[in-house]
Amino acid sequence: MSKPIRVRYAPSPTGLLHIGNARTALFNYLYARRHGGTFIIRIEDTDRKRHVEDGERSQLENLKWLGMDWDESPETHENYRQSERLALYQQYIDQLLAEGKAYKSYVTEEELAAERERQEAAGETPRYINEFIGMSADEKAKYISEREAAGVVPTVRLAVNESGIYKWTDMVKGDIEFEGGNIGGDWVIQKKDGYPTYNFAVVVDDHDMQISHVIRGDDHIANTPKQLMVYEALGWEAPEFGHMTLIINSETGKKLSKRDTNTLQFIEDYRKKGYMPEAVFNFIALLGWNPGGEEEIFSREQLIALFDENRLSKSPAAFDQKKMDWMSNEYLKHADFETVYALCKPFLEEAGRLTEKAEKLVELYKPQLKSADEIIPLTDLFFSDFPELTEAEKEVMAGETVSTVLQAFKAKLEAMSDEDFKPENIFPQIKAVQKETGIKGKNLFMPIRIAVSGEMHGPELPNTIYLLGRDKSIEHIKNML
């Protein structure tokens, strides 16, 4: 009988939730929900130097915003933060020390640096050389006594089986193996400050929490043999491992970097700009996985039902900001008005644009929005000075029939009563200009649009003219004549 599926997302509270970490959480979430398993949140906070105040809350809030829920976490269970589990780590470190599978190392940072420098100068691969090699028992005891008297605080190192082969069948990449002699020698499992290192603590945690599958980024592949060594030393069965391919920038073809200013890489950024969480969830789910077929828009429930770990990509996932924005626009276009207005309202309020026309403006520009904050630049026409025309727009307005069109349309607007000035009555006036002048198509619509709005493209022209108002529309046209 197969053991229950239990997966975890284990962030460090060292900053905002990055798109790559969000994908790790999301794939674990989808895997658990697809197979009726348990999704666990564990906080890995042993790196005290990089700890960020409020980092844990930020991580959890952004996961919730994306639409993920979990079954176990520090919110519901005790000792789900590594800093609360130090006694447990110490128990297993003491066990390994007692069994001779680990030992205290008194080598200093200066000595390690000097040895590394010597190895590099000699063209050797840097590795730790056991400081006790060649020592008799008496020499070893004397060495330890002298080091302790000098105030040297030891680390604890795992004794590596240099001839061991550490292999696993990866859920994504297939068979992978490492030789024990190629991982850099005996490595530290407990630092001088008493905190365990990541590769030791994560094994104790995963075993204690009965994690069945570890799904993470392929930057962790080099950690896996070290973790398998700990499982072996403690006599525990290792979980299954799956390493997702890295995420690359679609424009540069290089690994996604936090310095890539053309991409929004933190979930907080999407929240602040007014993206729909469902759109971001959908987009991230397709970074390195797809269900097959041409369809790209899926609800959370559909993604859970379709998720198949066998379709995780072996090739890097391309992060395309334009694709994200296209998908976001699809969600906003098809969302109900109340949802989109609620997203736009804070931006309108902050800009002092929460007027009686606010709802109509959101309705007008809803089909164009990629994020709710775009409602401000899109509505500048209604609250700011007329924009400076581009060279392309100036070229259109220099056309020989432009004056004829604008004169005729201005006359139509001036002749409309207040009662008749409605969107449904404005379009017939444009068609009347066409009939009277014989000018049609772009030569008719483009000059009117540019004269009224200062733009070649935009939402439905009659609605724009209506919301701008008859007087202001006429004023803009006069200024173009």
From Swiss-Prot:
PANTHER family: GLUTAMATE--TRNA LIGASE (PTHR43311), GLUTAMATE--TRNA LIGASE, MITOCHONDRIAL-RELATED (PTHR43311:SF2). ATP binds at K258. Pfam families: Anticodon_2 (PF19269), tRNA-synt_1c (PF00749). One of its GO terms (cellular component) is cytosol. It catalyses: tRNA(Glu) + L-glutamate + ATP = L-glutamyl-tRNA(Glu) + AMP + diphosphate. GO terms for molecular function: ATP binding; glutamate-tRNA ligase activity; tRNA binding; zinc ion binding. A motif ('KMSKS' region) lies at residues 255-259. It comes from the Bacteria. The gene is gltX. This is Glutamate--tRNA ligase. Belongs to the class-I aminoacyl-tRNA synthetase family. Glutamate--tRNA ligase type 1 subfamily. The keyword Zinc does not apply. A motif ('HIGH' region) lies at residues 11-21. Monomer. Its main location: cytoplasm. CDD domains: GluRS_core. Its EC number is 6.1.1.17.
